[in-house]
Amino acid sequence: MLQNTINEFFETLSELLLSIEVTDRNGAALSLDAGAEQTVQMMLETKDASQKVLLAGNGGSSAIVSHVQNDLCKATGVRAMVFTEQPLLTALANDEGYGSVFEWPINMWAEANDLFITVSSSGQSENIVRGLKAAREKGCRVITLSGFNPDNLSRRLGDLNFYVPSNVYAYVETAHTALAHFMTTKAAG
């Protein structure tokens, strides 16, 4: 539940930021610092290998991944792309169904060892999950940011998985944004 005052909101947000859970592909827990460091390392390895960072999210999460793309390209020099260009997104949604809007471009553009990052408050969106499965099949490395339910599907599909223990969009999306800012700023040096 959203708090009544801004101070209460910030106190709850601060507690949540420090409670973010990180797991690896096998579900083993990592510290938040270790997860963030591994993410930054993966971003820099992607740059050094001339690979791509591919990003996907819906709604507010789409805005977050667009911002991450901007920061990776401009500040870090990483080749990064999002799959939210309206003509392609609406064509795929209309012709193939909304569940395909991330899977289809992953199948077209992703290559082995690219890095696929998803941001999803629920971690359950069909199009995100299908994109994650396609990325795994292509041999991509995968990072997920999710919230709401600790057993969400996205969290089972990443090499690194960041989970915000809240079911309030405002907290989950703000935490995802903070994670993204830290990681892209650190990667930029």
Residue ranges and their predicted role:
Residues M1-G189:
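Conserved N-terminal alpha-helical segment that immediately precedes and caps sugar-phosphate-binding
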